[in-house]
Amino acid sequence: MFSDKEFWEKRFNDEGKVWGELPSKSAHKALELFRKHGVKSILVPGSGYGRNTRLFSSSGFDVTGIEISTTACNLAKQFDPQTRVYEGSVLDMSFGPGVFDAIYCFNTLHLFCENDRRLFLQECLGKLGEVGLAFFTVFSEEEPSFGQGKEVESNTYESRPGRPTHYFTEEDLREHFRDFETIETGIVHEPEDHGGQAHTHILRYIFAQKAA
């Protein structure tokens, strides 16, 4: 069984820029919201090779990413040199001092079982400053793959041993962000074309602010 680091290292080694170079639809939505709320600095946990960070850094934001794969970090430094990228796990974000106005996280939270999801969000809380905004996307229960594999926790399935995917209902997502004040939630249809197959993910997003 691969560790998380080994899994992502192999994937980025084998497939390079897996999801192409264009940012996700949700990153564009987050960009509009961050501008509206006066955000200046953004943390991107699970930043990959920089396809989403580059949208923010090229739009004038001060951007920091954290990514577990060495290969992805190296790709990001070439693809998006304006973003600072730290190599490490999102479950331990003690990579440097300072806090951020906002966090943007694309399709990372659902890759963990419940205890680690809670830990991840606590790590995020510790990295948010006074503005304290967060925009997360996750797999929804409307995903075509929902229910496939071995159920290891409620609404969490392993497509292969050690690779959990949690599928969020809206109620579940809001509950995970109970230490935040929810501003907006919704569904976003995110098209992807990798592995030779075009498909669309049905994601939930939440835009929230750290509770005072």
Regions found by a protein language model. Give the residues of each.
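A short glycine-rich, Lys/Arg-flanked "PGG" loop and its adjoining helix->strand segment in the class I
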Residues: R118-E130
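Class I (Rossmann-like) S-adenosyl-L-methionine-dependent methyltransferase catalytic domain
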Residues: M1-L43, G48-F95, F112, D116-L119, ...
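Short catalytic micro-motifs in class I SAM-dependent methyltransferases
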Residues: N107-L111
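A conserved beta-strand element that flanks and buttresses the S-adenosyl-L-methionine
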Residues: Y104
